[in-house]
């Protein structure tokens, strides 16, 4: 199921909604209201309702949203019917954490390969994911129909790795280095800079600290 021109931020929130809904479902609830979802994610109920209207879903005024139904709908929108395969490039602490944390979290996303240059990591298996030498990247990506790459290498190596991923046929990249990347328009790029995020938190923490003195 594909909805044209769905805003990037809405897609991001849909993923968060599904995670929240799965948690609520585990508590044996069958329905939920927008204000309950909003409270869990620290956003407004209006935002929740707007996002769900964009995907054509509305709840019952008395009972709220059917949790299982909404989880299934979000899955049809976000997930690929055939599933997608993911590779991590850079098997340091962050790369290993990705593999370990992600294991079994989503049935439609499979972490199936890792790449590194460290001989102590190559030809080993980490949490079920085999690690290959970086020189094997084009071959393994194409052979296993991998469409998503996660970059967790030292920042100076990121542009070269991104280029190799693009040339190998990758369609989406998650860049976890502070180095901005340039990729073709047909490759979706998501960049996450932990330093920037921490500085943002520090700014607002300082602001709150000053406000309540």
Each PLM stretch: what is its role?
Residues 106-127:
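NAD(P)-binding Rossmann-fold cofactor-contacting core
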Residues 17, 22-25, 129-213:
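Phosphate-bearing ligand-interacting subdomains
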Residues 91-92:
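Glycine-rich Rossmann-fold phosphate-binding loop(s) that bind the pyrophosphate
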Residues 95:
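N-terminal Rossmann-fold NAD(P) dinucleotide-binding loop
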Residues 1-30:
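Extreme N-terminal segment that seeds HTH/winged-HTH DNA-binding domains in transcriptional regulators
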Residues 31, 35, 40-85:
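HTH-adjacent hinge/linker in prokaryotic transcriptional regulators
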